[in-house]
From Swiss-Prot:
Transmembrane segment boundaries: none
Example GO molecular function: structural constituent of ribosome
Database matches in PANTHER family: 60S RIBOSOMAL PROTEIN L31
Protein name (Swiss-Prot/TrEMBL): Large ribosomal subunit protein eL31
GO cellular component terms listed in the entry, alphabetical order: cytosolic large ribosomal subunit
Organism, scientific name: Methanococcus vannielii (strain ATCC 35089 / DSM 1224 / JCM 13029 / OCM 148 / SB)
Length: 83
């Protein structure tokens, strides 16, 4: 059974609580943790487009939020960026 959802994931907490040199890696971990919690799965695969969006303006200037489409197939969640 396939389950598909669209989320707007806020990254403002990552910006406020992280030093500038660690924001992008922590944002990727925050996206993965958000999807694990909301899709109830331990395996989350992020598309390269999400990574490119977070790293687009370098390490320390991450976006405030990211819109993501998550599809759950069995135990695996695959996430792609929505423009």
């Amino acid at each position: 059974m396939e389950e598909e959802r669209i989320y707007t994931i806020p990254l403002r907490d990552v910006t406020n609580k992280s030093p500038t040199t660690k924001r992008a890696p922590r944002a990727i971990r925050a996206i993965r943790a958000f999807l694990m919690k909301h899709m109830k799965s331990d395996v989350v695969k992020l598309d390269n487009s999400i990574n490119e969006k977070v790293w687009e303006r370098s390490l320390n200037k991450i976006p405030a939020k990211v819109r993501v489409k998550a599809v759950k197939e069995g135990d695996v969640v695959k996430a792609t960026l929505i423009e």
